[in-house]
Amino acid sequence: MDDLISISDALHIVTPTNFHHEIAIKCLQKNKDVFIEKPITSNTAQATEIIELAVSKECIVQVGHIERFNPTINRLKDIVSEPHYIEIERLAPFQARGTEVPVVLDLMVHDIDLIISMVDSNIVDIHASGAKMMSETVDLAHAHIKFENGVVANLKSSRIAQNYVRKIRTYQNNLYTITDLMIPQIEIYGLEKTSIFSDQCIEKAID
């Protein structure tokens, strides 16, 4: 691996999460930029060490939070400017891969990233619960997040569901949206009309 790092300009780390820290540190010590699949590491101490080393080495570290670049998500952010309440549901059938970390780091991490990008305020309170069902780590989890500006977010993630579900519901004054990332589609409900954005988020108005 050392030889591979030495001859590379940048590296993409796609190993199981418990190896991310060790490999990333080796790359950064040799002044290599890295792209790390989510989650960055299995704990905050290791993540902090990677970030601090990257800063000191002036290297780039990017984590694979791919939903940031989802065109449906970007369209939703254009529509929803001042959300008061957000619900996100991310469910998947069980797979042994990825169970070395809890479902919060395996799936919900995407939605935590989205919530932070949608709400321009600091988090003031978090309540969470979860359960181990089919692995040695938490397989399903709920999180209730409250922001300083009063926005509330409820997140639900499970990797023991029957089907894949990726849904976001937002509520703001006179506007309610349902976003299905599996289709993808955004339904918009307001006082005057209903609109649906689908097929790469092209608007279709319903009279």
Please provide the spans of the model-predicted regions.
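Conserved SAM/SAH-binding loop
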Residues: 1-2, 90, 131
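Beta-loop-alpha module in the N-terminal Rossmann-like domain of NAD(P)-dependent dehydrogenases
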Residues: 1-51
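A short helix->loop->beta-strand "cap" motif at the edges of active sites that frequently abuts
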Residues: 30-32, 56-60, 151
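Hydrophobic residues in well-ordered beta-strands that form the structural core
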Residues: 36, 61-63, 179
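A contiguous active-site-proximal alpha/beta segment in oxidoreductase catalytic domains
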Residues: 41-98
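Mid-domain beta-loop-alpha active-site segment that forms a flexible
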Residues: 64-71, 94-123, 138
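C-terminal glycine/acidic-rich active-site capping loop/insertion
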Residues: 66, 172-207
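Contiguous beta-strand/loop segments that form the cofactor/metal-binding neighborhood of enzyme cores
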Residues: 112-185
